[in-house]
């Protein structure tokens, strides 16, 4: 009797295991599927003249392939080390144009097969739209001609989209400043195969500070090397006619922005030392203004590593912050400085002061206004 029962359980177990070998993902009944598997409404982007609308369509959910991609988490970034773009980006799968005063949607032709579109950016005169397309190997650059609704590829899959926008339009509307992977890009260190060369050492300054815990921080020297690797780019100028030229050699570029008159460009780079307790937004950085021949005009900001901050949601770092070009004049920077040393517990009449700094930056910045509370922005 015992033998028969044991045999029966064995046969049942074998039957269950065999029945599960070829199990695949199943679809729910149609009534449930209709509720869950719906088509998302497109996102809308309009030109400032209110002539065209760009309709961006996305999948309702990420695919299993999207969720199964490699991911590297360093310095607060989550990137795909194969394609060199954020692993959390939600891609656009189709683009259409529509005139504001019309009803017909115009399908944009020339889009890549199985589009994975991101980083949409209108040209300054709004006659072109640039975007990236992610392939299995990397990130490509496309440009749409709005008048004809035709997209064409400008660059193959070697853009670096790991940090910030991978490209910026020149104000002349015929060129783009593009971040490319370095020609001599080093391989990433595999922590499972490459042994560390020494211990991890942390030094305490003796200063009290209440820091929140951030995810995806750097943990060791291998992480530091890999972090520097993934954010290092070369800056190249690409014309819509296909010509190209190196603008700046490889560096850890965090951002680039042109002055409204198109004669200057402010380029921000990440500096060392890195930190194991705060993300890259608080790493040291340097902002330098260049002319269009890549000659440095002025170092306009140097931000130190900021691991210690005052308590409170209104706490900010000391020094210049939120530096950008004033959009209604030729080449003037606008930035903010805290008047309370960044500490909201300090009692002051004014928290922030906003400054204007006119190129070529030989004179001191001039005060625009002071705010009793923390400055948020000007429109």
Feature map (PLM): residue ranges:
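Bacterial Sec-dependent N-terminal signal peptides
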Residues: 1-23
């Amino acid at each position: 009797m015992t033998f028969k029962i044991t045999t029966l359980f064995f046969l049942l177990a074998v039957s269950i295991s065999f029945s599960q070998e070829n199990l695949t993902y199943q679809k729910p009944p149609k009534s449930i599927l209709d509720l869950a598997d719906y088509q998302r409404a497109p996102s809308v982007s309009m030109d400032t003249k209110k002539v065209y609308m760009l309709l961006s369509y996305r999948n309702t959910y990420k695919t299993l392939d999207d969720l199964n991609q490699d991911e590297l988490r360093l310095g607060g970034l989550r990137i795909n080390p194969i394609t060199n773009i954020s692993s959390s980006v939600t891609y656009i799968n189709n683009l259409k144009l529509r005139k504001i005063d019309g009803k017909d949607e115009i399908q944009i032709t020339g889009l890549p097969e199985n589009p994975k579109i991101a980083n949409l950016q209108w040209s300054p005169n709004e006659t072109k739209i640039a975007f990236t397309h992610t392939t299995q190997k990397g990130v490509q650059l496309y440009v749409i001609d709005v008048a004809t609704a035709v997209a064409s590829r400008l660059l193959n899959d070697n853009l670096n989209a790991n940090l910030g926008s991978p490209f910026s339009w020149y104000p002349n509307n015929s060129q783009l400043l593009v971040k490319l992977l370095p020609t001599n890009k080093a391989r990433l260190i595999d922590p499972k195969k490459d042994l560390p060369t020494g211990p991890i050492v942390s030094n305490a300054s003796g200063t009290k500070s209440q820091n929140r815990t951030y995810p995806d921080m750097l943990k060791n020297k291998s992480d530091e090397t890999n972090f520097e690797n993934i954010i290092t780019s070369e800056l190249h100028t690409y014309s819509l006619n296909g010509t190209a030229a190196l603008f700046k050699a490889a560096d850890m570029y965090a951002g680039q922005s042109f002055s409204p008159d198109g004669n200057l460009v402010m380029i921000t780079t990440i500096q060392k030392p890195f930190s194991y307790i705060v993300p890259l937004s608080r790493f040291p950085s340097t902002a330098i203004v260049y002319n269009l021949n890549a000659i440095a005009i002025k170092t306009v900001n140097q931000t130190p590593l900021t691991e210690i901050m005052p308590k409170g949601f209104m706490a900010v770092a000391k020094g210049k912050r939120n530096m950008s070009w004033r959009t209604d004049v030729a080449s003037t920077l606008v930035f903010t400085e805290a008047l309370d040393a960044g500490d909201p517990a300090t009692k002051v009449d004014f928290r922030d002061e906003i400054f204007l700094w006119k190129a070529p930056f030989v004179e001191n910045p001039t005060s625009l206004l002071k705010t009793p509370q923390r400055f948020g922005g000007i429109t």
